Amino acid sequence: MRALVLQSYGGREAVALTDVPAPTAGAGEVLIRTRAVGLNPVDAMHREGDFKAIAPDDFPTVAGNELSGIVETVGAGVTAFAPGDAVITRVDPSGHGAFAELAAVRADWVAAAPARVPLTDAAGLPLAGLTAQQALGPEHLDLQPGERLLITGAAGGVGLIATRLAHLRGAHVTVTASAAGEPYVREAGADAVIDYRTRTVAEGGERFDKVFDLIGGDQMAELLGSIEPGGRLVTIAGPPSPGSLRETARPSRRPLAAVVSRVASAKVRRAAKKAGVAYEFFLMHPDGVGLAELVRLVDAGELAVTVDSRYPLADWEQAFERLESHHAKGKVLLEF
């Protein structure tokens, strides 16, 4: 089967479109013939080796995190799906494997694809959707009706879905986005937009109950200062908090991951404590039940999968160039 294979860490030159052996469905798994895959910032980070200290790869390896496709076969014990079913999934975070014509995935990580959008476009839902859903949910921000939420960098895949889900929860949603991104976040349900190119969050003087940060970087102190005491900041881009890397790290690297997370986040955790704010970095986990709920919202017309661009597999380099430009409004998809 054809696959995008990561041959070493590096830039796009480290990736090759080549033939590799096809996987088979083990017990409790489904084998999916890929229709399309979603590209995500974490894919570029993986390629560059950002996680190699705690989760080193054995090269060559097939990367990729999410896909849509048609069930080819099912393994022993699988009753929820059958050959021919249209499905979407977030694949194993430790094994990856989405960037291939066939992928074997645990059945409990899979959901029936939404009927309301093309199967190709549905590939953009799993990772961004589950990240937003879990961040806003009871395990993390626990967003409640009427609360004031800030989402930074909201015009991308995760941000647009998070904006919509927060709006559906009855929160007052402020986002940061460029002028070009404002129409997208407004359509998703943003109540207020801060153009980060013309003013900072602090300059606006707004106060928030909770913040969902998608940017990271040197703005963290400013964000903490904008949150009411007793509030929360959850990030997928800031320094990792203690325990947050455990499931990502290989077992032999978990002691190192624990040290890295404590040291890397020490400064921001001190600042958060001083501000009376809870700080947390988190990584989403595959969840077929949660994914099915997102599909329900899509089919009900309450949630959209915003697609920035679609590329054929042969143009994978251009697809990654678009992703890494940081100008995509919504998802960049690669069609198989």
Model-identified regions with their sequence ranges:
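NAD(P)H dinucleotide-binding glycine-rich loop of Rossmann-like/cofactor-binding domains
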Residues: 56, 65, 80, 89-153
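Residue-level marker of beta-strand positions
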Residues: 85-86, 102, 148, 168, ...
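Mid-domain Rossmann-like dinucleotide-binding core that forms the NAD(H)/NADP(H) cofactor-binding site
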Residues: 125, 129-198
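A short acidic, Gly/Pro-enriched loop at the edge of an enzyme's catalytic core
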Residues: 202-210
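Glycine-rich phosphate-binding loop and adjacent beta-alpha segment
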Residues: 219-300, 336
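C-terminal hydrophobic helical "lid"/dimerization subdomain
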Residues: 284-336
